[in-house]
């Protein structure tokens, strides 16, 4: 189960001091519910002491930002906030409590939320994309898997191992994806990006099929986008459709929870061996040990 961070703040400066943390949580897919204070509803829009439009400020950097103006709305708003924060691709939610919603009394009735209209937390898996991904991997001579935090968020560590082991594919991990694959696993070739290891970084531009799983191709991993893995066919597994083609053009997009999509593709993979390709990482590993 995904745990949620809970942040409480008073009005004005303390609310605004949460902005950087909220933005980081959005980028890092960290579920957080921020409980913030606001002036009473009768003072909204009057530039009252310590009034700030926290909802307007945080809408671009949250999954949901909502102002609670009545005590009667607290139960359903809090339930919805926790559901949205932890479902699908996790992220931050802000609840801006007007003062009267904080101090008024109302009868509490427990509310459970497992659906929000127009909110689709997990896209439906597409069989055609599963088939296309498997075909590309089965035909690959130099496949490389890029492992992101989405594997951990989707609790798909076992599915990832089965996936790379069946097709004998080397893997590199992003900073937030390092815990998805044991460091001692023979197919784990280290960390990607500007602070990462030589092997996965250099061979990103030598592989023929690049498989990204639950990662967003940020600039610390890709460097110059115009030349990044330009020789490779790219498969992108992700739960968030907004990440597809955002930074790197994808040949096959596999949408859905990677626990399910990895398992589905693995079923279609042919057992393979890529000894020569795996051996190409050894010189870089030896250089780093010296």
Predicted regions and their residues:
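Conformationally flexible catalytic loops at phosphate/diphosphate-handling active centers
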Residues: 84-139, 277-278, 289
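Single conserved hydrophobic/aromatic residue that forms the stacking wall/gate
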Residues: 1-8, 13
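Anionic-ligand anchoring segments at beta-strand to alpha-helix junctions in alpha/beta enzyme folds, i.e.
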Residues: 9, 34-37, 125-126, 132-210
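Conserved thiamine diphosphate
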Residues: 49-88, 206, 252, 261, ...
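Phosphate/pyrophosphate-binding active-site segments
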Residues: 72, 135, 231-290
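Phosphate/diphosphate-binding loops
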Residues: 193-244
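Glycine-rich beta-alpha junction loops
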Residues: 39, 97-103, 149-151, 241
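Short glycine/serine/threonine-rich phosphate/pyrophosphate-binding segments
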Residues: 14-22, 26, 153-156, 218-223
């Amino acid at each position: 189960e995904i745990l949620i961070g809970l942040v409480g703040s008073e009005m004005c400066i303390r609310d605004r001091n949460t902005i950087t943390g909220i933005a980081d949580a959005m980028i890092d897919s960290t579920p957080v519910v921020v409980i913030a204070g606001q002036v009473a509803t009768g003072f909204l829009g009057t530039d009252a002491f310590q009034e700030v439009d926290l909802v307007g400020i945080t809408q671009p950097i949250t999954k949901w930002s909502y102002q609670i103006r009545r005590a009667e709305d607290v139960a359903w708003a809090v339930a919805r906030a926790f559901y949205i924060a932890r479902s699908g691709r996790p992220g931050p939610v802000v609840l801006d409590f007007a003062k009267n919603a904080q101090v008024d009394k109302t009868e509490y009735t427990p509310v459970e939320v497992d659906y929000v209209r127009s909110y689709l937390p997990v896209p439906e898996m597409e069989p055609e994309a599963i088939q296309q991904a498997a075909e590309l991997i089965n035909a690959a001579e130099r496949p490389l898997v890029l492992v992101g935090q989405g594997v951990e968020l989707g609790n798909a560590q076992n599915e990832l191992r089965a996936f790379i082991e069946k097709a004998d594919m080397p893997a590199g991990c992003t900073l937030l994806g390092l815990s998805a694959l044991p460091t001692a696993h023979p197919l784990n070739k280290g960390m990607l990006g500007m602070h990462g290891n030589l092997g996965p970084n250099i061979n990103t531009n030598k592989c023929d099929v690049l498989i990204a799983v639950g990662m967003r191709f940020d600039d610390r991993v890709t460097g110059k986008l115009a030349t990044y893995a330009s020789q490779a066919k790219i498969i992108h597994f992700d739960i968030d459709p907004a990440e597809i083609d955002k930074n790197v053009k994808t040949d096959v997009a596999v949408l859905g929870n990677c626990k399910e999509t990895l398992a589905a593709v693995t079923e279609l993979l042919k057992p393979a061996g890529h000894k020569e390709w795996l051996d190409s990482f050894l010189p870089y590993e030896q250089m780093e040990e010296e």
